[in-house]
Amino acid sequence: MWVLIISELLVFGAGLAAFLSVRITDPAGFAEAQDHLHRVSAGINTIVLITSGYFAALAYRLCSTGRKKQSRFALFSAMALGCVFLVIKTWEYVEKAGQGITTETHPFFTFYYLLTGFHAAHVLAGIVILGLVSFFATPRNIETGAAFWHMVDLVWVLLFPVIYLLR
């Protein structure tokens, strides 16, 4: 799992590096495009994912002390918050589409959709992994699932300021 996590972090790192490299060529255009984003909903999504990471870590601690039922509840809480993240992100995409904003609108939005879409796919994969782990709840399995989930959290904590806040 660690090889997968490190390789995924490298892929996201390359995407962020490309975003920042292209941003240097058109800072005004990127800033103008960025004004179309909802910083508040992205901030809420940040809180949602960090909280879900807490529940994933709690699940490991609970399972390690023999409390499997509570551990499963913590995993389902992390999964539910992952679903909340995806609902908010989908709303954001639908709203952008309604404004006619696509990957072709500006290079900023090409990167926005690619990076956040790839991340959303990882959130979905993480929800599936946490679901599988909940059925085979051992400390080792939960630790593995939580490690992937924390990678998803970490990526968002990097994407959020770079895409939504950095000017």
Feature names for model-found ranges:
Residues M1-R167:
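...captures the hydrophobic TM-helix bundle architecture rather than a specific catalytic motif
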